[in-house]
Amino acid sequence: MIKLNVNLQDRSYPIYISTDYSQIGKCIQSAKLTGKMVLITDTNVDKYQAEECVKAFSDAGYEVSKFVIPAGEENKNLDTTRDIYKYLLGLKLDRSATLMALGGGVVGDITGFAAATFLRGINFVQIPTTLLAQSDSSVGGKVGVDFEGTKNIIGAFYQPKFVYINVNTLKTLPERELKAGLAEVVKHGVIMDEEFYEYIDYNVHKILNHDEAVLQYIAKRNCSIKASVVEKDEKEGGLRAILNFGHTIGHAIETVMNFELLHGECVSLGMVGAMRMALYLEMIDEQSVNRVKNTLDKIGLPTRLEGIDVDKVYNQMFYDKKIKGSKLTFVLPRKRIGEVIQCTIDDEDLIKRVIASLGE
């Protein structure tokens, strides 16, 4: 088992990377979690992972209650949160209780939000089962729900007690989900580590064929990159914003498309848009733009969206949490892959040109 640490003073926590659930009991002991435990999962993950995970807890001497929520981004809302609260009330929990999120980004986000707000905060553990969650959303403490069609507009920063990654859960994912998760993996390479980006590009076939060694390395490198950013800027006051590369346009597309596209698919489109914006601003060369686009194409992620509604996407971007006054915030590559900067841009023609290019 691989162990990494996210160093945040009194909110520090470990990330464990394994190939099964056999060590999770030891992780609970190390975290000194002694209260009642509740596993939150969704209808998809419940079919494939919950039984094995609950058995691992049982084998380690822990009794776990389980609550299943409907799968899908459309259910990451206050109504589902209310259902979780009602279930927790019935268990008569105290503040020593622990909520454990077994699932992808939706389950992690909503479970973390419930943990942050129930009894003004109870323990929280992330057990991510998708590549997107293992590489990105489970690390860093961002939790929340969507509201009135806007993603993650209600939420908090709330760190887990630990993250437990079983890379073999990825074998149960539909190929589309696995590919969507790779978008966030590519993102980490583009923003901070060109060598890691090249590793991903070279190993796409092995990743999609669930090569265990490659998946473990990717999990380790991803978590290291994200942890290094979060340690310097836990609450997104500056540096952490670079993790939003591809997300300003991506989130807007995701909402306008009514979540018909997966988050990673929208981030893929957003990254292509960000690369083109940097090209139009003469911050990067066309070869670099094509490199990233070709990698995303190789994975099988969308790099164009036929019939994209430029005005709707543009207007939706102004609901972005990172907006500053009337200016939109973009993370753009500077000079090369592996280095980015944050820019505020209010050039409507430029932004619409970028969005329109995604439909060409």
UniProtKB/Swiss-Prot annotation:
Primary location recorded for the protein, binned into one broad class: cytoplasm
InterPro entries the UniProt entry points to: Dehydroquinate_synthase, DHQ_synth_AroB, DHQ_synth_fam, DHQS/DOIS_N, DHQS_C
Major enzyme class: lyase
Pathway of action: Metabolic intermediate biosynthesis; chorismate biosynthesis; chorismate from D-erythrose 4-phosphate and phosphoenolpyruvate: step 2/7
EC number: 4.2.3.4
Subcellular location: Cytoplasm
Keyword line: Amino-acid biosynthesis, Aromatic amino acid biosynthesis, Cobalt, Cytoplasm, Lyase, Metal-binding, NAD, Nucleotide-binding, Zinc
Record note on cofactor: Binds 1 divalent metal cation per subunit. Can use either Co(2+) or Zn(2+).
Molecular functions (GO terms): 3-dehydroquinate synthase activity; metal ion binding; nucleotide binding
CC annotations in GO: cytoplasm
Family matches, as SUPFAM superfamilies: Dehydroquinate synthase-like
Pfam families for the chain: DHQ_synthase, DHQS_C
Residues that, per the record, bind NAD(+): G105, V106, V107, G108, D109, T129, T130, K142, K151, T169, L170, K171, T172
Binding site for Zn(2+): E184, H247, H263
Function: Catalyzes the conversion of 3-deoxy-D-arabino-heptulosonate 7-phosphate (DAHP) to dehydroquinate (DHQ).
Protein name: 3-dehydroquinate synthase
Name of the gene this protein is made from: aroB
